[in-house]
């Protein structure tokens, strides 16, 4: 529990008799936090409801600095189940108390809160025209890794910054091609969205990300039924869709049994899923895709990434979303301890793309989540450009076998 009196050497620009406290934010602080929002921001202000949710129900930590009983600044840090990623969700200092080291102290406290939850990255967004904040972050060791266009209500861009917190491994994930991010637009298109990201990384000039391709890939690879509602996509259908577009693809799965069959109860639905699956298997025979009856460890995936392949992996969503549904993600990089993952699902309004990109997940944790259902189904695709494409650019064969 954070409850620290600020040391004398950190009291720059403050009256000598001021009492300064850094502590956890509480619901009773919400009126003061709303007043700071009003004074700091012309648009995109947090509401009372948002503050209450973030301080009481969300997977988040609120921090405030208090001067002689008055809240003068705050930081909100959100965390993401199943990952080692934190986000500086919101951060503000009352204009009348700037230049006193408040922002620097709150930022350091936010980083410590992230470390205490075993997070290795803290990410944030900042307005491109907020020069003072950008200077603060860069002096604190943050690096820019992207831009959101038209992000704020007034259409200003947001710079995306991140800082690595204390992990002794490589300073950046080791990976092959740079994988762009695409957010799924329908509940049942995680598989197509994951496949789109991988294909775009390998053949950027040939693949155009958008809903037309997302829905087309779903039509080509859906199991028709799965759990409830529209069917999702299985490994065999996704592999066929990739092979049709000229990619080399390996399917790593224990056997050729119909996947997700235990997710439906109706015998009629089960029969339809079997017919669809048998048709996929027939088409695979002449597609160039390879079925390998084995499963990949997290280290196998890391090795494949280092060799230029892109793994698309089936996981159970429970460890991230606390709901049991099958979900596809893309492995974008690896280091000695973590796999880094693009998750196409942005779950609710309190999350953004930045929360789902290159999510660091400990390898042991990833192996536990990379299985689904009572049958503990494990499935992964390794996607590469065709052999002729790799030979032309001198790339190495990235086989994980």
Residue ranges and their predicted role:
Residues 171-231, 236-252, 303:
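Active-site nucleophile-adjacent alpha helix/oxyanion-hole segment immediately C-terminal to the catalytic cysteine
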Residues 169, 305-306, 316-318, 322-328, ...:
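Noncatalytic regulatory segments and standalone regulatory/sensor domains
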Residues 2-4, 15, 24-98, 107-109, ...:
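Acetyl-CoA-dependent GNAT
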Residues 125-126, 138, 143-160:
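Conserved catalytic-core motifs of GNAT/GCN5-like acyltransferases
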Residues 266-343:
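Active-site-adjacent substructure of cysteine-protease-like catalytic cores
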Residues 88, 122-126:
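Conserved hydrophobic beta-strand within the GNAT/NAT acetyltransferase core sheet
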Residues 1-16, 150, 154-175:
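Terminal substrate-recognition subdomain of acyl/acetyltransferases
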Residues 107, 130-133, 150-155:
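Short glycine/proline-centered loop/turn elements that form peptide/ligand docking sites
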């Amino acid at each position: 529990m954070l409850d620290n009196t600020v040391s004398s050497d950190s009291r720059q620009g403050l009256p000598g008799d001021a009492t300064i406290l850094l502590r956890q934010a509480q619901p009773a602080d919400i009126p003061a936090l709303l007043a700071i929002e009003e004074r700091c921001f012309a648009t995109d202000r947090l509401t009372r409801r948002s503050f209450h949710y973030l301080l009481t129900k969300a997977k988040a930590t609120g921090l405030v600095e208090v001067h002689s009983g008055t809240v003068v600044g705050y930081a909100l840090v959100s965390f993401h189940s199943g990952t080692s990623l934190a986000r500086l969700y919101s951060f503000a200092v009352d204009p009348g108390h700037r230049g006193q080291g408040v922002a620097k102290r709150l930022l350091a406290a936010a980083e410590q809160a992230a470390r205490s939850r075993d997070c290795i990255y803290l990410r944030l967004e900042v307005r491109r025209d907020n020069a003072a904040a950008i200077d603060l972050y860069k002096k604190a060791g943050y690096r820019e890794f992207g831009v959101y266009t038209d992000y704020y209500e007034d259409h200003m861009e947001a710079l995306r910054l991140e800082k690595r917190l204390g992990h002794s491994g490589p300073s950046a994930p080791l990976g092959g091609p740079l994988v762009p991010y695409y957010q799924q637009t329908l509940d049942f298109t995680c598989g197509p969205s994951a496949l789109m990201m991988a294909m775009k990384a390998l053949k950027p000039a040939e693949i155009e990300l958008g809903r037309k391709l997302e829905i087309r890939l779903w039509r080509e690879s859906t199991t028709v039924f799965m759990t409830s509602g529209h069917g999702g996509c299985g490994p065999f259908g996704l592999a066929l869709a990739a092979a049709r577009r000229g990619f080399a693809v390996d399917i790593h799965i224990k056997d050729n049994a119909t996947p997700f069959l235990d997710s439906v109860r109706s015998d009629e639905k089960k029969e339809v899923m079997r017919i669809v699956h048998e048709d996929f298997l027939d088409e695979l025979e002449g597609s160039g895709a390879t079925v390998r009856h084995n499963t990949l460890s997290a280290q196998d995936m890391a090795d494949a990434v280092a060799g230029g392949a892109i793994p698309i992996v089936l996981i159970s969503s429970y460890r991230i979303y606390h709901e049991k549904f099958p979900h596809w993600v893309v492995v974008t990089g690896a280091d000695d301890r973590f796999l880094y993952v693009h998750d196409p699902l942005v779950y609710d309004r309190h999350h953004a793309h930045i929360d789902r990109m290159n999510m660091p997940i400990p390898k042991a944790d990833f192996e536990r989540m990379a299985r689904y259902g009572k049958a503990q189904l494990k499935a992964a695709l390794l996607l590469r450009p065709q052999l002729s494409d790799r030979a032309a650019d001198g790339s190495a064969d990235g086989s994980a076998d």
